[in-house]
Design a protein with these regions (language model features):
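Secretory-pathway glycoprotein ectodomains that are cysteine- and/or Ser/Thr/Pro-rich
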Residues: 2-222
Length: 222
């Protein structure tokens, strides 16, 4: 688990993010309380203890396995990066061991959730993928065989402050699921409130024991 704290003009904002590990026989589903901190010093070292309440479930079945990589300014895996500059191209490579479905969301510094995949041209709200096939999303040149080039949404990272942190949620399941209800915004991906996104995600993960979520953190600087 990771807790991220940002201080802006004397106001502290806290985000709690759960990152699954292969040696943990459980999966974090939802945070239901604000983290509580205990700060102390021992032998000149800063010690921070954190406690948080939430919902989790036992892993009782073999999970769908997938690999997702954030790519900067290139579509090959050697371009994997979590550090972007404003204006950089954003791509994502994805490969799953099983056929199924995938969605991608971005959470920005302002706590807005943006649906990056399915693309805005999607009519059924889901993206079906084949097993053992490498896909690169957000590039019209790699649209085939899932999409036509004109259907692809391409993205350049932007930064209004000196530096920003974004969270990329890659959601994968062998079972069909449909994107969250969202709103069209001119010049931006479809958008919904972060709280509504979390409710949608928790509902789907509770209903689908095979659904997996990987959260990737990227920084964007001017």
């Amino acid at each position: 688990n990771a807790t991220l704290m940002n201080n802006t003009n004397g106001s502290t904002q806290t985000d709690f993010t759960s990152l699954s590990s292969s040696d943990v026989k459980g999966e974090w589903l939802e945070t239901i309380s604000e983290p509580k901190y205990e700060i102390s010093y021992e032998q000149g070292m800063l010690i921070v203890k954190c406690a948080v309440s939430g919902k989790a479930r036992e892993l009782v079945a073999t999970q769908n396995s997938f690999v997702a990589k954030i790519l900067r300014n290139g579509t090959e895996d050697r371009f994997e990066s979590d550090n972007f500059k404003s204006g950089d191209d954003f791509y994502l490579s994805y490969q799953s061991s099983t056929k199924g479905y995938v969605a991608v969301y971005l959470i920005d510094d302002s706590k807005n959730a943006y649906c990056l995949l399915p693309y805005q041209s999607s009519q059924d709200g889901k993206v079906r993928v084949d097993a053992n096939t490498r896909y690169v999303f957000f590039n019209s040149k790699t649209a085939a065989p899932l999409f036509q080039p004109a259907d692809v949404d391409e993205y350049n990272m932007t930064c209004e402050k000196a530096a920003e942190t974004n969270y990329i949620y890659v959601i994968s399941s062998p079972n069909p699921f449909i994107k969250a209800i969202d709103n069209a915004v001119a010049g931006l991906p479809r958008e919904l409130k972060y709280e509504d996104f979390q409710k949608w995600l928790t509902k789907n993960r509770t209903a689908d024991k095979d659904m997996q979520v990987e959260i990737k953190t990227i920084s964007v600087k001017k």
